[in-house]
């Protein structure tokens, strides 16, 4: 099992499970969309300010992120420490620009960027930046047979 193979698995899809820690120490799991920026060893995720996962990360920035192949035979877990961007407050602030980059990397072009910018502010969106410190899992192809 190599880290490169696990990074490849993180890069292949755009959906996974973000694991944060509740106040009582139990895990809280959220299905989310992501993009893995391999050169930065960074998983980025768009979230809203009022969600449990966001509150959990403000209190304890440790997190894990799980992805798997469609057949679930291969998986990767990325563990690390999260940094949260500021909440989007203006359609042209740095947070909205980062959200646009993330959207493009996950989905592609948006049909109306002005509408998107306004929605990011209205929804009080921000970016979760999970700096990958450790990976483990079973790379694609290693569990066939």
Regions found by a protein language model. Name each.
Residues 14-49, 63-67, 75-78:
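Short beta-strand segments
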Residues 71:
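AMP-binding (ANL) adenylation modules
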Residues 74-145:
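Charged, gly/pro-rich active-site loop segments
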Residues 12-13, 60, 123-124:
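Structured helix-beta-strand junction loops
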Residues 1-17:
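Short, basic/aromatic recognition patches
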């Amino acid at each position: 099992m190599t880290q490169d193979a696990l990074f490849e698995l993180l890069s292949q899809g755009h959906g996974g499970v973000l694991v944060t820690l509740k106040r009582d120490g139990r895990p809280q799991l959220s299905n989310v969309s992501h993009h893995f920026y391999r050169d930065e060893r960074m998983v980025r995720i768009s979230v809203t300010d009022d969600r449990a996962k966001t509150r959990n990360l403000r209190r304890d920035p440790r997190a894990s992120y799980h992805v798997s192949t469609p057949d679930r035979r291969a998986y990767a877990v990325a563990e690390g420490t999260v940094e949260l961007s500021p909440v989007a407050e203006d359609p042209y602030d740095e947070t909205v620009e980062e959200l646009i980059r993330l959207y493009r990397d996950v989905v592609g072009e948006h049909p109306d960027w002005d509408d998107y910018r306004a929605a990011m502010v209205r929804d009080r969106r921000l970016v979760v930046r999970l700096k990958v410190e450790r990976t483990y899992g079973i790379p694609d192809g290693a569990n066939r047979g």
